[in-house]
Amino acid sequence: MKLDLSAYLVIGPENCSRLVEDVIAAAVDEGFTCVQIRSKVVGAREMISVLEKAAQVIDELGKSDSVALLVNDRLDVALAAREAGIKVDGVHVGQSDIPVEVCRKFLGADSIVGLSANTEEIISAADVSCVDYFGVGPLHATDTKSDAGAALSFEKISKLVKVSRLPLVVGGGVKAEDLPALAATGANGFFVVSAVAGADNPRRAARELVDAWILSVDNSAGKPYNLRG
C-alpha cells in the first residue's frame, strides 16, 4: 500500500455523537486518505469491533488498497484484529508508547508504523528504519489531546519538515483556514479529529477540508486552482 497522509482522520467512539463507521464512510468517500482508530476509554474488544466496521466501510468504497487503516498505540488490538481476519495496516504510537522497533517486529515489514514527534531533536534522532511517517503537533491547543504539548508555529513546522527524513502529517485543532499556510510548510498532510468527527455534518466538513488542502497544495506549487471533482 502506498501511504497517503494528505487527509488523515483520527477517530474513536468518544469523539462521535453518531456511529464511528458512518463518519469514516463519509470522510473516505469525500477524499480522506488515512484513518486512525484512537480511544483511551474503550476496551480491546470494542476497539476490534470498531476496526472491523471501519475496514468494512473502507472496503465497500473500494479503497482498501489506497486508504490506510491504523490503530493508535494498541499493538495488541492491531494483532488481535488481524488474527480475526480484519485488514489493519499498522499502528501509530507516541514517545511513551510501545517502541517502534517492537511494533515493526510484530507487524512486519509491509505494515505502517507512525510515530508522534514535535521537536527537531526527536525527529533527527529517530530510527527511521522502523518508522514510515511522523505525526507532528499540535498546531493549536485542542481538547481532544490535552497532553499534546505547546502549539507549534508554521515556522517551527517548516523547520521540522526540513530536518525530517520521513513524511510529516500535522494536526491539533486544524481548520480549513489553516491549510494554505500548512501546505506552504511542505508538510505532507493534515490530521483532524473533531473538525470531522464532531461536525454537525461530517460529510460536508470532510469535503471542505479536502478541497481546501488540494487547492492549497496546488497554490503552493504554483499550479492553477484545482477543486476536486
Briefly describe each language-model feature range:
Residues 1-92, 96, 105-133, 149-155, ...:
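Conserved N-terminal beta1-alpha1 strand-loop-helix module at the mouth
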Residues 140-142:
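A short, flexible beta-alpha/helix-coil linker loop
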Residues 144-146:
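Glycine/threonine-rich flexible loop motifs
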